[in-house]
């Protein structure tokens, strides 16, 4: 069979993948390679790459699998909860990347399926749904942007369709307690009662839990205004986290409240992700851990009590982002961004790498280490702004130079103390 040929697609790769994913969630449609090729205006080779990348993304971020049936059709497999959270993410992304697809294809398909199932129109009428969202807005004292209102109306229709089909997410005990403790749970129960009165049938107990999670994920944490009991508890937990980090690292922060506020905004969302197995970008940790090993280890140790309190284990990606926040605030306390350490290089890259790693282990603070060949250093001297020269090779000393420390392989205790003192001085 000859592959389908098509002119270059006008859509970007993220747009194509978003349309693929939303098509897979579109009710009443069997999607094959040909479906995606035609949808995105690409040939089969590009469509295949897009499908593979979409599969990798939903596996990484939502623990879902993209499978192929005997007829060549694709489907998303995994728990109902993970599938709903996946659609939450991609549908919101779709309103930015491919709004015309949502308007012209996803929405009509959803409404058509609701009608086909015989669900009363007043359940999914746009006016009624907007009134329900506005009621939630007033109860939560949160103003939804027009895009969020549009998203919620559409997403609630998808949940209604699943509810009617007897498909409901399952929560483990920890997830259940978390959802029940959030500000949005009372509003979610109200939505459940609304559906129950109109449908004259009981609402599964986990459905209001999901509605609470849905609305809580739309809320941007605000350390100055959030006043719910769980928000106050989180602020206290973060204070203990910062105290623990300060003790472990023997450091101080000039604006500890500012640090706590930033950690609150981040960790409020990180807890949601960790409790519900939502992944984040995994490109940071390996390189970051190599550059700032002591900062990463200290952050992980400081987080142990926080994780125990909430019954979670933050992934390396999540703890790496917390380390970035701590590192940024440590740099504000110091003048490290103005300093440079010059590591002289020659013909022994392994020795140089070991010495650089020792330097990075000396301090929590991010280091600005630049490499410069011995030959260039002897010819031109130290670069402007260099605060310290580390020389792994014997050589003639220049007449003028910043402080220079020679080490064969292992920094002595005295050298470590001197370097640390120099680096951590303001």
From Swiss-Prot:
Q: Which PANTHER family match?
A: CRYPTIC BETA-GLUCOSIDE BGL OPERON ANTITERMINATOR, STATIONARY PHASE-INDUCIBLE PROTEIN CSIE-RELATED
The chain positions of domain PRD read: 120-225, 229-336
InterPro entries in alphabetical order: BglG_antiterminators, PRD, PRD_sf
Please name the source species.
Escherichia coli (strain K12)
Q: Which residues cross the membrane?
A: none
Q: Which PROSITE patterns match?
A: PRD_2
Query: Mind telling me which Gene3D superfamilies this protein's record contains?
Result: PRD domain
Question: What is the protein name for this chain?
Answer: Stationary phase-inducible protein CsiE
Provide the alphabetized UniProt keywords: Repeat
Q: Which GO terms describe its biological process?
A: regulation of DNA-templated transcription
């Amino acid at each position: 069979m000859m592959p389908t040929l098509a002119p270059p697609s006008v859509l970007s790769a993220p747009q194509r993948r978003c349309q693929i994913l939303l098509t897979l969630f579109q009710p009443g449609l069997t999607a094959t390679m040909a479906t995606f090729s035609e949808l995105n205006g690409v040939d089969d080779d590009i469509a295949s790459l897009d499908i593979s990348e979409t599969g990798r993304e939903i596996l990484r971020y939502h623990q879902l699998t993209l499978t192929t049936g005997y007829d060549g059709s694709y489907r998303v497999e995994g728990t109902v909860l993970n599938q709903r959270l996946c659609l939450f993410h991609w549908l919101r992304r779709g309103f930015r990347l491919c709004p015309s697809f949502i308007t012209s294809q996803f929405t009509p398909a959803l409404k058509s399926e609701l009608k086909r199932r015989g669900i009363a129109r007043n359940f999914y009428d746009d006016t009624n749904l907007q009134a329900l969202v506005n009621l939630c807005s007033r109860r939560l004292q949160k103003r939804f942007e027009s895009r969020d209102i549009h998203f919620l109306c559409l997403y609630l229709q998808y949940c209604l369709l699943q509810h009617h089909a007897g498909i409901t997410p399952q929560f483990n005990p920890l997830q259940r307690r978390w959802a029940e403790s959030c500000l949005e749970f009372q509003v979610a129960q109200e939505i459940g009662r609304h559906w129950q009165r109109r449908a004259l049938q009981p609402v599964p107990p986990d459905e209001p839990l999901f509605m609470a999670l849905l609305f809580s994920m739309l809320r941007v944490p605000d350390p100055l205004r959030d006043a719910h009991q769980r928000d106050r508890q989180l602020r206290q937990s973060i204070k203990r986290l910062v105290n623990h980090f300060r003790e472990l690292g023997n450091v101080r922060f000039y604006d500890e409240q500012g640090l706590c506020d930033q950690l609150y905004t981040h960790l409020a969302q990180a807890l949601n992700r960790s409790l519900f197995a939502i992944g984040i970008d995994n490109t940071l940790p390996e390189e970051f851990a190599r550059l700032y090993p002591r900062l990463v280890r200290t952050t992980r140790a400081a987080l142990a009590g926080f994780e125990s309190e909430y019954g979670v284990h933050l992934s390396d990606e999540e703890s790496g982002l917390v380390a970035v926040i701590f590192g940024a605030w440590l740099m504000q306390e110091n003048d490290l961004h103005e300093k440079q350490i010059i590591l002289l290089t020659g013909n022994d890259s392994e020795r140089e790498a070991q010495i650089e790693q020792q330097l990075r282990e000396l301090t929590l603070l991010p280091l600005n280490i630049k490499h410069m060949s011995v030959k260039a250093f002897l010819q031109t001297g130290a670069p402007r702004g260099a605060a310290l020269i580390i020389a792994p090779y014997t050589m003639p000393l220049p007449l003028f130079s910043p402080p220079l420390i020679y080490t064969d392989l292992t920094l002595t205790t005295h050298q470590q103390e001197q370097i640390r003192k120099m680096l951590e001085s303001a």
